[in-house]
Amino acid sequence: NGMFQLGRIEKLHDYFSACSRRREQAVFFYRVAGYSGEVAAFLNQYDQAARTNGVVIEGRIPNPDPKQLDYLAEMMGSDFQLDAGFLTQKLTRWLPRLTGVQREAVVTAMTATLQDLQAHGKNENMLRNAYIKYMCWLYYKFERILGRLGGDELPKILYDGTVSSYELQLLVILARAGADIVLLERAGD
């Protein structure tokens, strides 16, 4: 179906294995709460990997500002449809550097995530707002790693903070499209 499956790690170090060497060639998405010496060493290494080939988010991803929203509307119009054809057309214009395979992965992942929201009773306007956030964040925050989605050396995302529901949805999209994710919650549960 064009989406990466979330895999299970045996040990933290599995995060650093190439995609082709993993069972089911899966991505990893884990929440880390609580520390030990081993976890601290892993996080240090993962942080370095994310800085080299990925994105480190400390705190929150800022909401799109008025300039970013205006630019999106100017470039893409303000219409929205929960439809793979519509999303493909929009992503082709908005993120032209994605390969066809990467674009399809992002579209499939975004469609699945928006359908999940719809199944949980979110209305058209809420879905449109989610779509606008995703598009702005992909462009302004994650654009430099999108071209590496699904490669053998998967891009790494480290989210260090308390994740919001929109942010979590976007991280799920990125994982489904071919990125490894670690959510670090220092406050624990």
Predicted regions: what is each one?
Residues N1-H13, C19-M135:
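Conserved N-terminal ligand/cofactor-binding loop architecture of enzyme catalytic domains
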Residues L12-R22, F142-G151:
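Short boundary motifs at domain starts and secondary-structure transition points
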Residues D116-D189:
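Active-site and donor-binding regions of nucleotide-sugar-utilizing enzymes
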